[in-house]
Structure formats: C-alpha cells, structure tokens
Amino acid sequence: MIRAIFGGTFDPIHNGHLQTAAALVKELGISTLALMPSAVPPHRPQPDASPEQRLDMVKLASQYHKAFTVEDWELRQDRPSFTANTLSEFKTQFPDDTLLFVMGMDSLMSLHRWHHWCQLIECAHLVVMPRAGVPFNPKNDELKEFISVHLTRDKNALNTQSQGLLYIAETPMVDVSATELRKQLQQREKNLPLPSNVYNYIRQHQLYL
C-alpha cells in the first residue's frame, strides 16, 4: 500500500497547497494523501496559529478533494516534530507500506539543515513539488550528492521499491506564500487564495491580526 504524507506548518493552509496536492494525487494515481500539520518545527519560527487551530483549518481544507485525509500524529506528540523521527515511527507502524513524504522545492533546497536529514530516505521516498521562485539548484555539496544518488525521473519506480528515491513532481507552480498571506490577512484584504471555510474560520477566531 502507498501511504502518502504531505507535511507542513500550514499556517494557514491555502489554495497553493491544495491545488498542487490535488495535481499530485492525479499525477501519481494515489488514492489518498494525508495532510499532516507539523507540531513545533524546530528549525523555523513558531507558527502564529496554535496547533489546534492549524489542525482545525487542515480538517476544513481536506474537504477540497476526496483523496485528502488528515494526519494529526505530530500534533499528538509532546516533543518537537523532527520529520526523521516521524517517518521512522510510521515505518515501524506500517512496515509493509511504501511511504511517500511530500514536500515543496523550498524544503528540498534547505533539506541539509534538517535534523538527521539523510535518514529520511531510509524510511520513505521523497516527492518534491516545484514552487514558484524556487529553482531546482542546490548549493550545498552534500545535498547535491544526496540528490544525484537518489533522484529518479520515473514515477513508476516509486511503486517498485519501498524507499530510497527522490522524485520531482510535475505539479503546477502556484505562486502563493503563507508569509504574504498572513500579511494580507492582517491588513484585512479580501479575495485571498484560501478555501472559503478556512477564511471564515480565520475571521471567526481573529487569527493573523
């Protein structure tokens, strides 16, 4: 079984996340894609919304596509959410499944700064979605070597081995930035790239003001 996980801060989750994720579901022909908000990203500033609020927004956004599900494993842990630990735990829980960990190109380009980053590929395939303004051009030598060893252009290869591959998806580059979106919400702008139910939740709870 393919178990695909799209991890992110989702502060807030927006149409850019959802449109590219829906395109990935179609490209890979997977039946489900779990949206997993991270708990306390150790290498990034703390999210503006609480873990509970981010989870609520992800649950609302999951209605966007029938393949989307919600995974709250990291939010249920009483420790920082290192992706290497999460994938290792999932591999232990689901030893017969093939794990796909989905990330954006910006995450790949900074992957060498992640905790035990080389171990990610020992538990899962990494699937990377292109992002507007972020070229596929690694600067770090270790990361370059990592990519050269694990990169595949064949999406079907993800089904023939259980881990160890890095695949660059052909999903559209939707130019939405959560940072800019939070600024727009603070300025009370309208017609933002958010699902209507997520936008209403943000306004109801007076987030990002």
Curated annotation (Swiss-Prot):
Keywords: ATP-binding, NAD, Nucleotide-binding, Nucleotidyltransferase, Pyridine nucleotide biosynthesis, Transferase
Gene3D superfamilies: HUPs (3.40.50.620)
Organism encoding this protein: Idiomarina loihiensis (strain ATCC BAA-735 / DSM 15497 / L2-TR)
Reactions mediated catalytically: nicotinate beta-D-ribonucleotide + ATP + H(+) = deamido-NAD(+) + diphosphate
Gene this chain is encoded by: nadD
EC number of this enzyme: 2.7.7.18
Residue ranges that the Swiss-Prot or TrEMBL entry lists as coiled coil: none
Biochemical pathway: Cofactor biosynthesis; NAD(+) biosynthesis; deamido-NAD(+) from nicotinate D-ribonucleotide: step 1/1
InterPro entries: Cyt_trans-like, NadD/NMNAT, Rossmann-like_a/b/a_fold
Any one biological process term the GO annotation gives: NAD biosynthetic process
Family statement drawn from the similarity comment of this UniProt entry: Belongs to the NadD family.
Function: Catalyzes the reversible adenylation of nicotinate mononucleotide (NaMN) to nicotinic acid adenine dinucleotide (NaAD).
HAMAP family: NaMN_adenylyltr (MF_00244)
GO MF term list: ATP binding; nicotinate-nucleotide adenylyltransferase activity
Major enzyme class: transferase
Protein name, as recorded: Probable nicotinate-nucleotide adenylyltransferase
Family matches, as PANTHER family: NICOTINATE-NUCLEOTIDE ADENYLYLTRANSFERASE-RELATED (PTHR39321), PHOSPHOPANTETHEINE ADENYLYLTRANSFERASE (PTHR39321:SF3)
